[in-house]
Amino acid sequence: MIKVAAAGGGTGGHLYPLLAILETLAKRVDVKVLFFAVKGKIDERVVRKDHPEFETVSIDVRGLLRPLHHPKNLWRTLKIGIATIEVKKHLKRFKPDLVVLTGGYISGVVGLAAKDLGIPIFVHEQNVVPGLAVKVLSQYAKKVFVSFERTRDYLREWQDKIVVTGCPVRETEKEAPLKDFVLVLGGSLGSEAINELMEKVYPELQETQFVHSTGSDDWTERLSVFPNVTALTYIDPMGAYWKKAIASISRAGASTIAEMMYYGVPGILIPWESSAESHQLENALEAERLGYGIVIRENEASPRKIIESIDKVVKKGKIEKMKENPASKISEEILGEIM
C-alpha cells in the first residue's frame, strides 16, 4: 500500500484532473488517500460524495487577492499560516509516501507543509500559464507534470523536472442517452453570458440538436422551451456526454479543453476574460493552434458569429480520440519514482 496526500481545489478545473490521477493510481496499486479540501468549495462536496473511502479534511483558507499588496491580504496571509500549521499536524499523523498537487491556493499550503516535512511532492499544471502555487512549488517538486509543451517557457529553471503529459480526464463507463449533438457548457463560473447568447442562437438552428448544461434551475426551465435543446442544470459524469457530442461550445478552462481534446470533439471556445493571468485565453489559443477549436473573444461573440462557427466545427467532424489518458502516464511516472 502507498499513502497519498492530495490537494487541488477551490474549482473543478483543479479538482477533476486530481481525481483522475488518484483514481488511476488506485487501479494500479492499493492506495490510501488523505485529501485536503477547501472549506465550502466544490472539492469538499464532490470528494465526500464520490470517494467516501478517502479521509477528507476541510481547510479554511482563501487565496491571495491581486494585486498582491491588496490590504485584505494581510488577514489572508495570517489564515494561510494557521492553515499550514493545521495541515502539518495531519501530515505528521498520516505519514504519506508522497503528495500530489494540482494547483489552487490549497496546493500552496499543503505543498509548503510537505516540503518542510521532507515528503516527496508531485505537481500537475493544467493551464498553459502556470498559477502562483505551481510556480512556487516547482522548485521543491520531484516532478512537474504539464498539459502543454508551451508551459515550459514559464518554468525555465525547472526544465529537468518537467514532463509533458496532457491534462488528466476522469473516465466513465456511462453513456449519454442521446447522440450527435452540440454540447454547450454554460453553467460554470463566469458563463452566464453563454446562456444568454445561446438563447438567441437556438431558434435559428432548429435542425441542430443541443445538450446545454445551464448551471441553474432557472436557466434549465428557460431553455427547455426550445424543442432542439436538452437543458440540464448539471451534467455528471461529463465524459458520458463528451463521448456522444459532435461539437462543443464552452469557456476555455483547462479541464474542459482536456475533455474536448481527449474525446476528439472540436469546439468553439469563448475565454472568460476575467480568468487569472488570462489563463483561459492562453488555453484557448493553444487549443486552436493544435487544431481543436475556434476562439471567439467574449466582446466579439454574437449569435451570427456563433451560428457560422457551429457550421464550421460540425463540418470539421470529430478528431481522433487520444489513445491514452494523461492520468496513466502521470501515475506511471509517480510509481516509478517512489517504488
Curated annotation (Swiss-Prot):
Pathway: Cell wall biogenesis; peptidoglycan biosynthesis
Keywords: Cell cycle, Cell division, Cell inner membrane, Cell membrane, Cell shape, Cell wall biogenesis/degradation, Glycosyltransferase, Membrane, Peptidoglycan synthesis, Transferase
Any one of the GO CC terms: plasma membrane
Enzyme Commission number, as recorded: 2.4.1.227
Annotated signal peptide: none
Record's subcellular location: Cell inner membrane
Family: Belongs to the glycosyltransferase 28 family. MurG subfamily.
Protein name: UDP-N-acetylglucosamine--N-acetylmuramyl-(pentapeptide) pyrophosphoryl-undecaprenol N-acetylglucosamine transferase
High-level lineage: Bacteria, Thermotogati, Thermotogota, Thermotogae, Thermotogales
Chain's gene name: murG
